[in-house]
Amino acid sequence: MNSTINHNLPALSNEGGLSAYLEQIKKFPMLAAEEEYMLAKNWKTTGNVKAAEKLVTSHLRLVAKIAMGYRGYGLPVNEMISEGNVGLMQAVKKFEPEKGFRLATYAM
């Protein structure tokens, strides 16, 4: 796997804050089931980091939505989103698309 790729993933920062991050992640389109399957197969068989990156970015809004549901539990939302994003990346690594489930279902 190529680890020298320049990643342009959005990040939560103190400068723009949560609202800027939420605006950034709206730019990433959701994937059709077929495209998600092909990207996941590509990632699994060839280690194509761009395919994995597209899988991750297409699910960032889901992570943010779930984290927002836990506001008021004493944890900062930005930390919950960051941890959720790490979990999403781990789920992409272990995801087996041939089992017939969507990534969002597996990641939960």
Task: Enumerate the language-model features and the residues they cover.
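Alpha-helical promoter-recognition and RNA polymerase-docking modules of transcription initiation factors
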Residues: 2-108
